[in-house]
Design a protein with these regions (language model features):
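Adenylate-forming
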Residues: 2, 31-33
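Hydrophobic beta-strand positions
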Residues: 4-5, 56, 156
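AMP-binding/adenylate-forming catalytic domain of the ANL superfamily
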Residues: 138-162, 181
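Generic structural signal for residues in well-ordered beta-strands
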Residues: 3, 98, 149-151
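AMP-binding/adenylate-forming catalytic core of the ANL superfamily
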Residues: 9-12, 22-25, 29-30, 39-40, ...
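Acidic/polar alpha-helix N-cap and adjacent early helical turns
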Residues: 170-181
Length: 181
């Protein structure tokens, strides 16, 4: 098979730059009993398929998966992958777990939202929220940083241990028809 890392216009990306992973397999790819999802995951020419993973090749040719395309936040026309923000937040000594996703913003379409589970003994407060936002601003480009952070006693996880963002994100999109305002 073949693997390609492409931008939204199906152009190849240079080494080190993240993009959507597209593949060409020896046999046609399809989702079981879901022709619509199969069609959505196939390139216009019918040659390539994606399952929505985002990644890049390093200088040695190793593939790194960095996020899922469905988690991408589009804020003011900028594509933001939340994994980088999540990875940073969980390094803060007051953070036990973190989820980052897009929420509605009238001017930007979406804005970056953080939801954090604090370490035992740390109480949620406006001061802790400000500290975490400032921490992100020190280490990441401004557009990748949460504009606000909410606190949860525990973040939802699947039985496999994987973070389950959908119920968190759905709270903010409950009255919206689309993830793009």
């Amino acid at each position: 098979g073949e693997l390609h890392i492409l931008d939204d216009d199906m152009n190849a990306l240079p080494q080190g730059e993240p993009g959507t992973l597209w593949f060409k397999a020896a046999t046609p790819f399809s989702y079981f009993n879901d022709t619509e999802k199969t069609k959505e995951s196939t390139s216009a020419d019918g040659v390539l398929t994606t399952v929505g993973d985002v990644g890049y090749l390093d200088q040695d040719g190793f593939l790194f998966l960095t996020d899922r395309a469905t988690f991408m936040i589009i804020s003011g026309g900028v594509n933001i992958y939340p994994q980088e923000s999540e990875n940073l937040l969980i390094t803060h000594p007051k953070v036990a777990d973190a989820a980052v996703f897009g929420v509605p913003n009238v001017d930007l379409g979406e804005e970056v939202k953080g939801v954090v589970q604090l370490m035992p003994g740390i109480q949620p407060s406006a001061a802790v929220e400000r500290e975490l936002i400032d921490f992100c601003n020190e280490h990441l480009a401004r557009q990748k940083c949460p504009r606000s952070i909410d606190f949860e006693a525990e973040l939802p996880r699947l039985p496999t241990g994987k973070l389950y963002k959908k119920p968190l994100r759905d709270r903010y999109w409950a009255d919206k028809k689309s993830r793009i305002v």
